[in-house]
Amino acid sequence: MKMTKSDRIDRIVERLAEMPAVEKVEPLAEGICDRISVIQRRLMLRHKRSLGRHGISWRDWQVLTNLLLGGDTPRSPSDLASTLMVTTGAMTNVLDRLEEAGLTRRVRNPADRRSVIVEATDDGVALWYAAVNELGSQEAGVVSVLTAAEQRQLNSLLRKVLAGFGDGDNWDEETA
């Protein structure tokens, strides 16, 4: 692998290490975590711009993704709100917007006619596929600086770091 020259994070970590009152910062860990954070922010900005070109927000995308990747379990508005950690009022606004755009619909729950479930429409599914392919291309471009073997190694190492939080697949909770 071709080594890159030092970057801004290296310089920040070096200055941090020189500060006498900073005792608990491990420079290597700081560099790793800072880089993960910067990569996440940059990728999120690219994704949000792409989703905007498709006429949806990040939150809209999360709802469609949960509907399409959530398996066969019907999803209620309150279930979606809980999964995405937003209020039911905020979820109502998102669902109203998606329904107005023709991307989702609320239908009576056949198991309990007092409640509704949310479904993606054919247009919602088509938009999701177009967007997921665009986002996937962006992600592939980001890691294309690595060989396939390096990508597998990085993926394995990041999985190990993520497992180190010790909370299983509960990775999207803000209680960490």
Predicted segments, located by residue:
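Charged, amphipathic alpha-helical coiled-coil/dimerization segments
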Residues: 96-156
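N-terminal leader segment of winged-helix/HTH proteins
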Residues: 1-54
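C-terminal regulatory/oligomerization modules of transcriptional regulators
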Residues: 1-24, 149-152, 156-176
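Alpha-helical linker/hinge and terminal dimerization helices associated
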Residues: 43, 84, 127-146, 161-172
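N-terminal helix-turn-helix DNA-binding core of bacterial DNA-binding proteins
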Residues: 27, 37, 41-87, 169-176
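Alpha-helix C-capping/helix-to-loop hinge sites
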Residues: 19, 50, 70, 138-145
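Amphipathic alpha-helical interaction segments
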Residues: 31-38, 62, 153-156, 160
